[in-house]
Regions:
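Catalytic cores of the polymerase beta-like nucleotidyltransferase superfamily
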Residues: 1-478
């Protein structure tokens, strides 16, 4: 039977303890456990050197040998095991030039970024913490807190992280300027933790971000974008964005020009409609950018360096949002025979997120205009218009892949069988018949063939555009 990630990590710790070494859970997993959250992964820190860790387990991978990191594999579950260490200078603003192994857990946690990430935890059911005789044990440390957990584990705190968690406070370990000089991305991580946890940032840490904000330009765009995606998909994204603005960090980010003018609207949108979908969150962030001045596809792919898939999904969502807001009443009118256009629009990458964005716009506008002092007739008109939009959005959300891309009832072979020569007329007829199908005006192959036959003569006589069975001219589609 497969074991859980925490069980695997605790088996690793027990094995290390049994061999005479100290071993603890460390970092974000301890923070999350203290907060009652489920960690995504579990990291172990130990007094054992990599060459002492490897013989204790059947399967290991040296994932970061130069940093003292070994991955232990138990029943298919990976646990990263890192030797206690202290870091040298960070010449590249990301990695230490040299790593020194340490003898104590206290030295190891003192190099980490924030106090909430500097906690240690023993395995469940353990009856003691560090050996009294071990160098750097709590008994010999100058300042520490030992706190039992309800499930029998013990939290060891050398940095005041437990108090900061209780006070919902993000604070650097040691001198914040030193921490940010080592790795400037830590400034953005502070904003991300504020967004994820709903915490505030200590005055000293906030002022250090303000003083050192320009250092973020040393960080690769890809790393910056990864943090931004985490911020906008967090429960308190508005807090993270507010911190970006108040510390001046936003002024040095590649997305500044697109989002700064409408940041307040983005914060309101993300506060009202929080999401865990990173593509939707990013679309919500840049939804307020001037469409006349912003190429969303270029912004995502070239400025933020997102993948083609994510760029298409985000830019597509914004395109669908605009299409729905501009044409909502038209799509709502059954006499307009426009459902085929709506279904084609819903083929756009990220379309469902586009519907969510448009719905947000309507609901936020309705909330803004819902104050007093409005004539009853105007209020009724506004509410009726909003209801039309919302009906269209509900319809879009109800569409299945088969509704949006039904199997074609007529093919090019059918047109050849009718005596047509392959050419641009094929595309016109095939698309026009599919439009009828999307509109629900043909449902069988026989009806589709009959419609194609009626179009044939008109299309062949035309110079490139023929009659649209839905009532409009059919443009040539390239």
């Amino acid at each position: 039977m497969a074991i859980e990630a925490r069980q695997a990590a605790e088996q690793v710790m027990r094995a290390l303890n049994g061999a005479g070494f100290e071993a603890y859970l460390v970092g974000g997993c301890v923070r999350d456990l203290v907060l009652g959250r489920e960690p995504k992964d579990y990291d172990v820190t130990t007094s054992a050197r990599p060459e002492q860790v490897i013989p204790l387990f059947e399967k290991t991978v040296s994932t970061g040998a130069s940093f003292g990191v070994v991955t232990v594999v138990l029943d298919g579950v990976n646990t990263e095991v890192a030797t206690y260490r202290s870091d040298g200078n960070y010449a590249d603003g990301r990695h230490p030039d040299i790593v020194f192994y340490s003898d104590t857990a206290e030295q190891d946690v003192s190099r980490r970024d924030f106090t909430i990430n500097g906690l240690l935890m023993s395995y469940r059911g353990s009856s003691s913490v560090l050996s009294e005789a071990a160098p750097g044990s709590p008994a010999q440390a100058s300042s520490f807190t030992v706190s039992p957990t309800p499930d029998g584990a013990i939290v060891v705190d050398y940095v005041g992280g437990l108090d900061d968690i209780r006070n919902k406070n993000i604070r650097c370990i040691g001198n914040p300027t030193h921490r940010f000089t080592e790795d400037a991305l830590r400034m953005l991580r502070a904003c991300r933790f504020a967004a994820q946890l709903g915490f505030g940032v200590s005055m000293e840490t906030s002022l250090a971000i303000d003083r050192n904000a320009a250092l973020i330009r040393k960080v690769s765009v890809e790393r910056i974008t990864a943090e931004l995606l985490r911020i906008v998909s967090s429960p308190h994204a508005d807090l993270g964005l507010a911190l970006l603005a108040s510390t001046g960090l936003l002024d040095y980010l590649p997305i500044r020009d697109a989002v700064k003018p409408s940041l307040a609207n983005a914060m309101r949108r993300l506060s009202t409609f929080p999401t865990t979908d990173q593509d939707l969150g990013m679309a919500m962030l840049i939804a307020g950018a001037d469409p006349c001045e912003t190429d969303n596809g270029h912004l995502c792919k070239e400025v933020l360096k997102l993948s083609s898939e994510h760029s298409s999904a985000i830019a597509g969502a914004l395109e669908v949002r605009m299409g729905l807001l501009v044409n909502g009443p038209f799509y709502h009118d059954p006499e307009s025979h426009s459902r085929f256009r709506l279904k084609r629009l819903m083929r756009t990458p990220g379309a469902m997120n586009g519907v969510a964005l448009a719905r947000q716009d309507v609901l936020l506008r309705r909330e803004e205009e819902g104050g007093g002092g409005e004539a009853e007739l105007a209020k009724q008109y506004r509410e009726r218009a909003a209801r039309q939009y919302l009906d269209v959005f509900d319809y879009c959300m109800s569409l299945t892949p088969g509704d949006i891309r039904p199997e074609r009832l007529v093919t090019g072979d059918d047109l050849i069988a009718m005596g047509m020569e392959p050419g641009r007329g094929f595309r016109i007829i095939l698309d026009a018949v599919e439009d009828l199908q999307l509109e629900g005006r043909v449902a069988t192959r026989g009806e589709a063939l009959e419609a194609a036959g009626k179009m044939r003569e008109a299309v062949e006589a035309s110079t490139g555009s023929g009659p649209n069975p839905c009532g409009e001219a059919v443009p040539e589609k390239g």
